[in-house]
Design a protein with these regions (language model features):
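Short glycine/serine/threonine-biased micro-segments
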Residues: 24, 67-68, 113
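N-terminal [4Fe-4S]-dependent radical SAM core
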Residues: 1-23, 36-41, 156-159, 167-176
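Conserved Radical SAM active-site core
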Residues: 2-9, 18-19, 36-93, 98-105
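Surface-exposed, flexible loop/turn segments at secondary-structure boundaries
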Residues: 12, 73, 100, 120, ...
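Generic structural signal for beta-strand residues in well-ordered domains
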Residues: 13-15, 24, 58, 85, ...
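Classical nucleotidyltransferase
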Residues: 103-176
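Cysteine-centered iron-sulfur cluster-binding motifs in ferredoxin-type domains/subunits
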Residues: 21-34, 71
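Short, flexible active-site-adjacent loop segments at beta-strand->alpha-helix junctions, enriched
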Residues: 28, 71, 98, 115-118, ...
Length: 176
């Protein structure tokens, strides 16, 4: 059972998205320099589709849902991502502190962040980071059967580009 203890709408966790970030508790990763150690505890309210529906309704204008954590129960994250995709037009992101899972089903995710936080390497906006931020891309494999396959494109550079541009005051998103 997944629990969460807080939410916030952000503009920087997922590039070019207005994101409702849901902080999942019970994190098993325990990064030594974690800035959210309170999320290690098994606290908060149960996160299930009816709760998620209420959170979405209360946050008009969002374009993306980000599950911040959830490494204690990847199947629950997957099931919630499936619910979001089947019931809304929102994009779905998972911020995981674990390395990329080889058998992670991708069909309900638009973005996936992987890797534990290591202070000496920095976060996503550091060129030395061990963390990676992927956009899940879809490509038609066979036109007649309309078989889609998914692959990951590393877009970590967007966080680094934004940091540099903000430092010099000249940022424009490539997609705009």
């Amino acid at each position: 059972m997944l629990k969460y203890n807080e939410t916030m709408v952000t503009f920087g966790e997922v590039p070019s998205e207005v994101t409702l970030c849901i902080n999942i508790t019970g994190c098993p990763v325990h990064c030594p320099d974690c800035h959210s150690k309170h999320l290690w505890e098994d606290i908060g309210n149960e996160l299930k589709p009816v709760v998620l529906s209420d959170l979405i309704a209360k946050n008009d204008g969002i374009t993306c849902i980000a599950f911040m954590g959830g490494d204690n129960s990847p199947i629950d994250i997957y099931n919630l991502a499936e619910w979001v995709k089947n019931n809304t037009e929102l994009k779905v992101c998972w911020y995981s502190g674990m390395p990329l899972r080889k058998k992670l089903p991708l069909e309900y995710f638009d973005y996936i962040k992987t890797g534990p936080y290591k202070k000496e390497l920095g976060g996503l906006d550091s060129v030395t980071t061990n963390q990676r931020f992927y956009e899940v891309k879809k490509k038609l494999a066979y036109k007649s059967d309309e078989v889609m396959y998914r692959y990951l494109e590393d877009i970590t550079y967007k966080f680094q580009k934004l940091k540099i541009a903000n430092e010099i005051g000249d940022y424009q998103d490539d997609e705009e």
